[in-house]
A protein has these predicted regions:
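Extracytoplasmic/periplasmic solute-binding protein
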Residues: 158-166, 171, 195-241, 277-279
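Glycine-centered hinge/linker elements that transmit conformational signals in sensory
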Residues: 201, 237-266, 310
Length: 448
């Protein structure tokens, strides 16, 4: 009997020990779950995370920072009730690059991220973004033909599709109509040329002893001229370029002639705001922002203004750059399907895209949304000057994407330096082109 009792007690002690061990294990697991509640453990189950910055991508005042995203999340969670979509608030645009880099380095990159133009190349280069070719190609409910072609191209890097476009803005030529009317000059058509552009600038430019100076243009740089005359300068990425082609010579000659009209004065954007300049290239987002009553009072209030396509060079077209805010997917996400469906909702759902017209200053990337009658009403509101939607369509259709390759910002600085040196110097332009061609290509070799 004593032996039996002893065995029972031992069994109870073993069971007690197992229970204690089990409690310890469960406690440790509960701590881990609490610590990882918003991290990897939760994400593997049902949490889809979004990387987004606060404020406007277009650097204008906007009180609807998260409105479109919140509406998209609400619509998504209704359709997929098992998925919870979250994002971190309060990350300003100027801090977003650093914040995203820290997330990548810590292994906690959000499943879906909004991509700043300056970050696109580096994110694709390091493999942080997922190639979307397989997802977009196999999805029967998705077609790239719904987009403006240039907006779709904005999501590519080295020929591969790493992102979907979200909103865009083409560069347009802002026009001080008051100056043109005063000088009895008709507003140019959408297919206007460099000859017309220079002729108007020359006619309106004059100075007086009273200080009532008037200028032709500000902000028209080599990128504007190259694009307008068909120069695809960085078509090979960081590969060899040719700075000596005739179209570049024509572009430099135009810039030199425009500068000479100013008698050495550096015309600025402030001069345009004060009503003293006929033309200034700006993104369409500025047009939308300054159509609002509050900003119209603060800026451009002393004159009547409108916008046009960019003027065409002799060997080019009415071409300008298209700036596009894109969204991409983390290459390490374990929620590929869920992330893709959310990206499609932001990028290709007409209802969500329509909200860009309501709560942002860019344009929807879906062609049928931007070119709808409702879009024109939402863009113009009750203002007298109606926007020429055919002109806007032409501007987007004829737009080009900013080159994307590793080291682009440095390469662009080299061309900036070359153009400034040539325009400020007294040497023959074509001779200087040959010298700078060598310098630019030497630099490109250092980044390859």
């Amino acid at each position: 009997l004593r032996v039996i009792v002893s065995d029972i007690m031992k069994t109870k002690e073993v069971n007690r020990g197992l229970k204690v061990s089990l409690c310890i294990i469960l406690f440790i697991l509960s701590i881990l779950i609490m610590q990882l509640g918003d991290g990897s453990f939760r994400r593997t189950r049902s949490n889809l995370t979004i990387g987004v910055f606060s404020g406007s991508y277009w650097d204008v005042q906007n009180g609807n920072t998260y409105r479109i995203l919140d509406d998209a999340i609400e619509k998504y969670e209704k359709k997929y009730p098992g998925i919870h979509v979250t994002y971190e608030t309060g990350i300003v645009k100027s801090d977003y690059t650093e914040w995203l880099n820290e997330k990548i380095m810590s292994g906690s990159m959000p499943d879906v991220v909004f991509i700043l133009g300056i970050d696109f190349s580096s994110l694709a280069e390091i493999g942080a973004l997922k190639n979307l070719a397989a997802l977009s190609g196999s999805d029967k409910n998705f077609t790239k033909e719904d987009y403006f072609s240039s907006a779709w191209e904005s999501g590519k890097y080295a020929g591969k599709q790493y992102a979907l476009p979200f909103e865009c803005a083409p560069q347009l030529m802002f026009v001080n109509k008051t100056i043109l009317n005063r000088e009895k000059i008709a507003l140019p058509d959408a297919d206007w040329t460099w000859d017309e552009f220079y002729s108007i600038c020359k006619k309106v430019a004059h100075s007086s002893e009273e200080g009532n100076n008037q200028y032709g243009v500000t902000g028209y740089d080599w990128t504007c001229a190259f694009n307008a005359d068909g120069v695809d300068f960085f078509s090979n990425g960081s590969g060899k370029v040719d700075f000596t082609v005739p179209a570049i010579t024509d572009s430099l000659n135009l810039l030199e002639k425009l500068n000479e009209l100013n008698d050495g004065y550096q015309v600025s954007g402030a001069d345009f705001s004060d009503g003293n300049v006929a033309f200034q290239p700006m993104p369409f987002s500025q047009y939308r922002a300054y159509k609002s009553q509050e900003l119209r009072i603060k800026k451009y209030s002393g004159f009547e203004w409108s916008c046009l396509t960019m003027p065409a060079g002799p060997d080019g077209d009415n071409v300008s750059e298209l700036d596009t805010l894109c969204i991409g997917m983390s290459s390490s996400t374990n929620m590929e399907k869920e992330a893709w469906n959310f990206m499609k909702l932001l990028s290709a759902d007409p209802e969500i895209q329509r909200e860009i017209l309501l709560y942002s200053d860019g344009l929807p990337v879906m062609r049928n949304v931007t070119l709808s009658d409702e879009a024109q009403e939402l863009i113009e509101g009750d203002h007298e000057n109606s926007l020429n939607m055919e002109m806007l369509e032409q501007a987007i259709d004829h737009s080009v994407v900013t080159p994307r390759f590793r080291g682009y910002s440095g390469a662009k600085e080299q061309v900036d330096l070359a153009v400034r040196s040539i325009l400020d110097g007294v040497s023959n332009i074509e001779t200087e082109q040959i010298l700078w061609n060598r310098e630019i290509n030497n630099y490109l070799q250092t980044i390859n």
